Amino acid sequence: MKKALAVILSTLASVAAMTTTHAETFSFDRDAAGVLPAGWRAGVTGRGSPKWSVEQDASAPSKPNVLRQSGSGTFPWCVRPDVSLADGYVEVRFKPLTGREDQAGGVVWRWKDGDDYYVARANALENNVSLYYTAGGRRNTIKYVDAPVPGNVWHALRVEFAGKRIRVILDGKQYIEMDDDHISGPGAVGVWTKADSVTSFDDFRYGIRAR
């Protein structure tokens, strides 16, 4: 009986170890204002002069700081290059502030470099959610879905990915669920904007598997 119990406990411990979720959250509140947060890398797919910096924001979900993109470029991005994630989730709070051409906020995953990655974004000017893959510096549309995205309001964007399966969730509602295999294997994670979007981000989080 004791031997059987020991086997059961050992099995349960092994299962728990295999399903343990590693998660990390970045609220930018310990980073200096006016500069890029420590451990992050910024750039642009295409052309332009993006400007990513930590800024104080009284409306931040976790006060006092946010990460803000206030420059412009084809597709500005800001990633954690030390992360290597193949399957899991990434989520962020974002607030589209201004932009004549676009008012977008998004997340990237399986980021290999500035020209190759997945991106999901929401756009306050278009009121939609979309999923893309970027390969060789060219953004390719996978799917668009209409969704309410009011400007100057904080939203929650989450993507879950495992193998080919991708789920995109905005403000607690799933808008996209589908299979796509254009980009596989581990990569970095981060945030993304488009064109002249001025967008704030807070509470960026990723984990090794979807919850």
What are these regions (language model features)?
Residues 169-190:
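Short, solvent-exposed beta-strand-to-loop segments that form ligand-recognition rims
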Residues 33, 69-135:
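Secretory/extracellular carbohydrate-interaction modules
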Residues 183-211:
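Ligand-recognition surfaces built from glycine- and aromatic
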Residues 28, 90-92, 153-168:
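Short tryptophan-centered beta-strand motifs in secreted/extracellular beta-sheet-rich domains
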Residues 17-23:
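Boundary at the C-terminal end of the N-terminal hydrophobic targeting segment
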Residues 33-66, 73-74:
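Extracellular glycan-recognition surfaces and repeat-rich motifs
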Residues 1-11:
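Bacterial N-terminal signal peptides that target proteins for export
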Residues 135-156:
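Short, aromatic/His-centered strand-loop micro-motif at the edge of beta-sheets
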